[in-house]
Amino acid sequence: MESVLACFQAARAARSPVIVQSAWSEMEPQMITYADLAGLIRCFGARFAEVPFAIHLDHGMSEEECMGALAGGFSSIMYDGSAGSYEDNVTVTRRLRRAAGAGGTLEAEVGRVGGAEGGGGDFEIVKSDPEQLRDFLEKTGADAIAVSIGNFHGSHGVHKGAPKLDFELLARLHDVCGVPLVLHGASGIPEADVRRAVTMGICKVNYYTQLYNVYMDCVRDNCGETMEECMGRATRVLAGEIEKLMDMCGSAGKA
């Protein structure tokens, strides 16, 4: 709840739209259903009525997860078929695009971002191929594409250095792509590189590790306070960090 509130507080302050997202791997341990989270987000959406928002499933790892999110009230889903074969990725993405219908949005992944997503230990990175991307879009009709251009999930310390984005590849991907491109694993990428990527076709930027660390550091620093004071302080700190990122990514002032 605190992170959802922080997203809306930041969006109001920055006058920015916001995509509030979560993965099933984060929801299941907390015993939260898709409908629970969608309902909570819509409650805050009514309170912050001036903020345009979307409810997005991040890294749906199966068709079942994605269909569950749509049934639970999510307006947008990501199907991550990057771990399987290209043919299976195309087949499932195409089915989910039909299931999402005219009112839903489907993000997919071409190549493999890799890294420590969801606490896993798979660090394989396969960069996106422009010709494969062209073929994928023709066959699936996906609305947005997560690209692999040197970015990765999780703490960059695990990878012994900050991500180094391949801007030449990003330009080639943008040239063949008529849909928004998505940058996953933005935590640890230098600010100048994120800003540059946004000018080159990146329209959605995913942050998790950086925001998680800011929030948890504040909780640890203030755990001697009452729970209410501690959580309130951490929520305000998180909102401030999100607001900074909205400005950096160029969405501030666009609501």
Describe the role of every protein-language-model region.
Residues 29, 33, 88, 125, ...:
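Catalytic cores of large soluble enzymes that bind and process phosphate-bearing ligands
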Residues 219-255:
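Extended, intrinsically disordered, low-complexity segments
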Residues 1-26, 34-50, 59-177, 191-207, ...:
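Alpha/beta enzyme core
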Residues 180:
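Active-site-adjacent substrate-binding region
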Residues 211-212, 241:
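Short, highly charged low-complexity linear segments
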Residues 183-187:
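Glycine-rich beta-strand-to-loop/alpha-helix junction loops that act as flexible
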